[in-house]
């Protein structure tokens, strides 16, 4: 199976979610199933069927997280020498050459991406256009709104 790039924080978040699902959510669902069984006829017991459905979702998510963590390639850029090159995990400050608007993005794994927080997926068009570029480079990024030109003014490995 293919390795999944992940930051240290992304791996921590998945481990926290896995711990919650296994130690809190799973026991809650088991209890709900047991209570629903006590109500009798399982064929027409909506509570029972809802709890079983929740159990399926929970177990599926547990398997998904365990699979991702098992194939994770955890990258800690803070331990790498900063040579000004944009890599996975780097925080990049860009200036839109048309509007002079400054934006900051951190390139992270798919599960960590949150554009409102400035976290972009390594597979996003912006990240793909930035990876491998260097400090002071000018890059053209194809976005849904068209091609946008950015200057890379800062690259941090934090």
Swiss-Prot record:
The keyword Membrane does not apply. This is Transcription elongation factor GreA. GO terms for molecular function: DNA binding; RNA polymerase binding. Belongs to the GreA/GreB family. It holds the Pfam family GreA_GreB. Necessary for efficient RNA polymerase transcription elongation past template-encoded arresting sites. The arresting sites in DNA have the property of trapping a certain fraction of elongating RNA polymerases that pass through, resulting in locked ternary complexes. Cleavage of the nascent transcript by cleavage factors such as GreA or GreB allows the resumption of elongation from the new 3'terminus. GreA releases sequences of 2 to 3 nucleotides. Keywords: DNA-binding, Transcription, Transcription regulation. GO terms for biological process: DNA-templated transcription elongation; regulation of DNA-templated transcription elongation. InterPro entries: GreA/GreB_C_sf, TF_GreA/GreB_CS, Tscrpt_elong_fac_GreA, Tscrpt_elong_fac_GreA/B, Tscrpt_elong_fac_GreA/B_C, Tscrpt_elong_fac_GreA/B_fam, Tscrpt_elong_fac_GreA/B_N, Tscrpt_elong_fac_GreA/B_N_sf. It comes from Haemophilus influenzae (strain ATCC 51907 / DSM 11121 / KW20 / Rd). PROSITE patterns: GREAB_1, GREAB_2. The keyword DNA-binding applies.
